[in-house]
Amino acid sequence: MKQATRSLNLPKPIAAYFTADKGNGEAVSQCFTDNAVVKDEGHTHKGRPAIREWKTDASAKYEYTCEPLACEEKDGKTVVTSHLVGNFPGSPVDLRFFFTLEGGKISSLEITP
């Protein structure tokens, strides 16, 4: 994945996630706690190995760019709205990334349209 750059004041673990999200599943998984949970496209991925596999598979399947547009705090979560463009069904699309942080890492992420 190619990363578009935009000046947002993202919390460090979330900024690290978007920086790592360039097709490197291992780098992405290191942004998460050991027992983190990711929910995306109707699937739940639990723990770093499953998160690494999720990101590696998604990056191999599609080419896309992701540009974070907005960031807000809501109900204890950090919500980042991002614009994605690529060779996936429904492109382009704005997605919302609901992050929960714990100890300087991401403990949960849910991605929704």
Ranges and model annotations:
Residues 36-46:
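A short gly/proline-enriched turn/hairpin at secondary-structure junctions
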Residues 43, 49, 110-111:
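Short clusters of small/polar residues that mark proteolytic maturation junctions
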Residues 1-26, 30:
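Short, low-complexity N-terminal intrinsically disordered segments enriched in polar/charged residues
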Residues 29-30, 39-40, 67:
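Short, hydrophobic secondary-structure boundary micro-motifs
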Residues 33:
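Helix-to-beta-strand junctions that scaffold the AdoMet/dcAdoMet cofactor pocket
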Residues 2-3, 53, 57-113:
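A beta-strand edge to alpha-helix "cap/lid" segment located at domain peripheries
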